[in-house]
Structure formats: C-alpha cells, structure tokens
Amino acid sequence: NYVKAAGGDGITVMYALRPLVKHNTADSVACEMNDRIYSEPGNRLGKVAAAIWPWKCKDALFRYNEVTDTRLNQDGMAYDADSGDGTVYEYNYSRMNGCGCVMFCLEEAIHNTFRHNVSYDDLGGTISPASNPDARLEQNIFYVRDGVPFVRNHMDGGNYTESNDRIIPIEK
C-alpha cells in the first residue's frame, strides 16, 4: 500500500489480535492537522495524527514499512505504539517526520519493542516515551540532526531501555 497526503493518520489498525502490517509506505500524511481545519478542538485536543500505528491492539507486528514527511502536529511521528500490549516495530525506515520517529503513548501502551529500524533525520525529537512504563529499543540506527533532541521535549516522562542502538549525528 502507498498512502500519500492523507489528511490525518496514514494506516491505523484498531482493536485487533496479532495484526500484521507490512510493506507499506506513508508519505506526507497528517497534512490537514492544522488550525484551519481544526479551529476549535476544545477538550478533545484534536490535532493528533501519526503515520502507521495500532490502537488498542494485542501483539501487533509492523515490519518493512517506510514513512517520510509526516506533518508537524501534536503527534506527528512515523510510528506510535498506542494503548496496546506487545506492539513490535521491526525493519522499518523513517525519514524527516515532523515530530520524530516513534512514540510509546502513555501508560496503557505496555510491552512494546522497537528493533532493527532505521531513522534518518526525523525532526522534533527522535523518540517520545510519553509516560510509557516499559518501552524497549533494540539494535536500531538513529541518524540525528545537530540540535534535534534524541528524546522529544515535553514527551520525555516515560521509561525505556536501549540495547545496542547506534545514534549517529548528522550535520545540516
């Protein structure tokens, strides 16, 4: 599948047991997450979208996907392990996403693993642990631009462990 210029999320699976999401490309998604479209989000927070992610899934597996240029919004990252149990992202690629590579979203997202992925020049902060209890990062390669924090500002309240990740600075 190839998703380009979606107004919000690119690909989202919901309430699924062991979904497999592979060989997809999301390009320039979340292009309508802005004040012109969401002029009064109120208490709903409204302007949130990520490229490829699960919602309330058990043992979701995401592999061989590519995400580029997810637009800046309150989420805005390539991948988001959100409110599920056992999500695994492996062998994926991300580049130049407005708010980073991956978010582990809040307390309900448990037992999630991000491994063997490549992130190149994702912006705003490469990872967002966002109050997550136990995210795992394993054997990833992160190319991080000078001045971009590895952990996204104001999304750093969670716990994560890293094992054999490579963080390589790039100059722009």
Model segments located where?
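Extracellular glycoside hydrolase catalytic/binding regions
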Residues: 102-105
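Right-handed parallel beta-helix
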Residues: 1-9, 17-42, 48-71, 78, ...
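Active-site rim elements
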Residues: 125, 152
